[in-house]
Amino acid sequence: MRKWVSSTVALLVSVLTFYGCGGGGQQSAVPRNRTFIADCSNQQDCSGQFKDYASFNPFLLTGTTKTGWNFAYEPLYFYNAYDEGGDNIIPWIATGHEYNSDYTAVTVSIREGVEWSDGQPWTAHDLVFTINMLRDHAPSLSFSTDMQAWVKNATAVDDYTAQIELTASNPRFIFSYFTNNFDNGIPIMPKHIWEDKDPESFSNFDMAQGWPVVSGPYKMAISSPEQRVWDVRSDWWAAKIGFRELPKVERLIYLPYMEESKRVQNIIANAMDTSLDLRPPNIKSIIDANPGVSTWTGKDLPLGYLDWWPVCLGFNNLEPPFNDPEVRRAVNYAINREQLVKIGWQGAGTSSHLPLPNFPPIRTYTDGIQDLIDKYEIGVYDPAKSAEILQRKGWSKDGDGFWNKDGERLTMVVDIFGIFNDLAPVLVAQLKQAGIEASFRLTSDTFTRMAQGTARAYMMGNGGSVRDPYFTLRLYHSRFVQPTGTHAERFWRWSNPEYDAIVDKMGQTSPDDPELQNLFRQAMEIWLSELPSIPLVQWYHRIPQNETYWKNWPTADNAYINSAYWHNTWLLVLLGLEPSQS
């Protein structure tokens, strides 16, 4: 394996020239100690090879790999959830914004001197074009459903002033959609490239024309089935106007998605600089084998940081038998979360009773509903109560100990991503012990199965709230529900009109308003009583940070941002990294 790794690195970064199918001509040599290498984090779209190598449209619901658009298109703001010393908001393309008195409109001020990679100015016209384009193409594009729900119209007052009229009061509109944090943040497109295109089919890729046109400090050099390569560009607007220095990382190479064992071997061999977050035994094996690798917490547990993505057992809530909240509650009683953590993660983690991350700002809300968690017994492991519910619903156990009704067993096939390979076997074993004929599967089309609802059960994180609970609760709003077989932007397919109305009010209520606490409690009373998904564990990012070639990684003591390279804050890490070797 080491031989294979070494030959791969030599092929990619030591030759004088290399070429890419679909675009990218002769490239100058960049030494390994100025090159950053990682694999694609998206199994469905880049396992074996990049399926989107000839496309760069981040709005396609079919999936677009995060191998560029998450740092090539810069936001109005960044948000750092881990810096406890500041206000956490980092102005970027915007210099400020102001709401009207009832939060039904917001005016955004754009920084002068921002440019696209083709030299055209980045203006308010680009922002309003992107917003209106998404609103007008709902629900066919990513982010479009929310824009349709919230935006009446967006206009450019002048090149540096945008005004957005909202359909209702929304004091967190800019933070929710145009402040990059974790996976949140809508990429803003250049109007002069997109305005005469159909965004539902436009590839945004033609390297002969200089596409994609981006605003960030890198230009696409190669995009082929085998790799995606970005090179730093010296004409980045932020360097020209003195806003930021050029990144020291001169070249980024993304390789196709790898199984975790290959990631481990590549990191140990210094053939990669980071990877997708790893399972506890694997991150420890890297730390033990390679003294040049560290983590967010150095060599100390938990070897990572708490992420915003608490994991639930989800269902297609439109389809039987899991469209019945009582059946879902029976499943809840069959799950031993402490055992999940103890066996699946070797004790290196925490269970979760809510779909919300255990961040300090969120705890100011969740601490106040502990009585509801107790009332609905979320986290209670009680197979007898599970059995009582199923018996009452007409199920009885067959000769093999599985629940059966009308000649059919209660089965559950849980679709998973590779990152759940440690938890899923434990979960399935628990469900089997409770009489549910359970299994799990990891397939190349997992994401599609979840999005279309053909996955009747699945493990999935809740990527939403970081400051207040609204953004997670809105993931369960019925406006995202699509029929089984139709691609849905959110997968839960649960509908409750009373819940919708409360969440709509939450969206119109300022996080500073005490009423938000009351609305949160009302919404969670409904959510916990119906349990559209079953909370399992808080999620941790145990990300290896290879310091052989790069230093000044984000850490618990230097928390300038989190270190996930697939997140929409990755640009800040690229700007923070320093060469370890002269």
Protein language model annotation of sequence segments:
Residues 40, 67-68, 225-227, 232, ...:
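Detector for C-terminal structural segments
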Residues 145-197, 548, 556:
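Surface-exposed binding/hinge segments that line
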Residues 78-84, 182-246, 251, 261-262, ...:
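Gly/Pro-rich hinge or "lid" segments in bacterial periplasmic/extracellular proteins
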Residues 111, 206-208, 236-289, 428, ...:
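Ligand-site clamp/hinge motif
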